Amino acid sequence: VIDNSIIQATSSWPFVEARKLVKERQKIYEKKGKITLQTGYGPSGLPHIGTFAEVARTTMMVNAIKQIIDIPTEIITFSDDMDGLRKIPDNVPNREILEKNLHKPLTSVPDPFKKYKSFGEHNNEMLKKFLNEFKFNYIFKSSTDTYKKGLFNTALLLVLEKYEQIKEAVLPTLGKERQKTYSPFLP
C-alpha cells in the first residue's frame, strides 16, 4: 500500500484520473457497491497492441483506485461483435468466406479459420486467450449475447422514447450525407 500523501500528491495519470473518478462518481459507486470500468473491442480483426494498451491502461486505473479507496472493482471487456464486417483483414485464410459475408454482423459471418461458429466468436476467443496470457483480470461480455439476453431492452426503449431528442442533439455533429441516414438505432 502506498502512503496516502504520495497518492494525493502524485501527478501520475492513473492516480490523477482515479482521484477524479472517485470524487465525481461517489454516488454511483456507493449505490452499486463497486466501481466498474469498461474496455471495448471491435472483433473485425485479431487482437493487437492497441487492444493490449486499452486493457493495460484500464488495469492501471483499477490499481490506482484500489490505492485510494477500499471498494470492489471490475473491468468489463465488451466485444462489439454485432458490428458489420466492413473489410477483409489481410491476415486471414479463406478470404472468399469473408467476401461473401461483407456487412453482416461478425457473429453471423462464418469463421474463415474453421474453428468456431463465427468470425466474431473466433476473434473473441483470440482476445480472451491474449488477455489471459498477460494475466489481466476482466469480465468478458459479448454484444450478441447481451442483446439475446435482453439486457439492452430497457436502454433501447429509452432511446425509442427519446428518439427525436437524440437526433436533435446528434445531427448537428454529423456531415451532410450522414445526417440524411442517421438513426440512434443504426449509428
Please give the residue ranges for each predicted region.
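Non-catalytic terminal extensions that flank enzyme cores
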Residues: 1-49, 63, 67-77, 90-103, ...
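Glycine-rich, histidine-containing beta strand-loop boundary motifs that form or position
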Residues: 39-41, 77-79, 134, 142-144
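Short, solvent-exposed beta-strand-terminating loops
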Residues: 80-89
